[in-house]
Amino acid sequence: MLHRLAFPVMSWMLLSCLMLLSQVQGEDSPKKIPSARISCPKGSQAYGSYCYALFQIPQTWFDAELACQKRPEGHLVSVLNVAEASFLASMVKNTGNSYQYTWIGLHDPTLGGEPNGGGWEWSNNDIMNYVNWERNPSTALDRGFCGSLSRSSGFLRWRDTTCEVKLPYVCKFTG
């Protein structure tokens, strides 16, 4: 027979085990695991979690951004790392794009008002941790306030361009 002081301790242990059981017990039916592959519309390419589409009909930066926003969570492309930059460069080169520049989602809404080019940002508000300028936009005499991929860099590097120029553009959106 158990000592009478053992009952409260054992009751507490049993209660603790039951509480833990509810936290570690698995679900009866497993949840559907999302597919690693995304489905993109015809004419666009998948990379990571997004679809990318190059549009050859030239637009101003602002009109291109508005056109991209018509797609699900769409904006002009933000280039967040070297791998994405390489993917984009390959995509733009393989389409036979004959323009010197192609719009991306980079712009400076301060129109150079921030020192050392600090006003540049992505149109979709992604954080700008990766930078790949062809030239320093804050020191150029003919500087623009919208970003583009430059043909002379193999479409890997960025160039500040006048926003009113009509250029092809790349949209980034969800599938």
Swiss-Prot record:
Maturation-removed propeptide residues: 27-37
InterPro entries: C-type_lectin-like, C-type_lectin-like/link_sf, C-type_lectin/snaclec_domain, C-type_lectin_CS, CTDL_fold
Function according to Swiss-Prot or TrEMBL: Bactericidal C-type lectin which acts against several intestinal Gram-positive bacteria and Gram-negative bacteria. Lacks antibacterial activity against S.typhimurium. May play a role in protection against infection with S.enteritidis by inhibiting its translocation from the gut lumen into intestinal tissues and further extraintestinal tissues.
GO cellular component: apical part of cell; extracellular space; protein-containing complex; zymogen granule
Amino-acid positions noted as binding Zn(2+) in the UniProt annotation, renumbered to this chain: 107, 121
Tissues with expression: Constitutively expressed in intestine.
Highest taxon listed in the record's lineage: Eukaryota
Intrachain S-S bonds: 40-51, 68-171, 146-163
PANTHER family associated with the record: MANNOSE, PHOSPHOLIPASE, LECTIN RECEPTOR RELATED (PTHR22803)
Location within or outside the cell: Secreted
Signal peptide: 1-26
Protein name per its UniProtKB record: Regenerating islet-derived protein 3-beta
Disease: Overexpressed during the acute phase of pancreatitis.
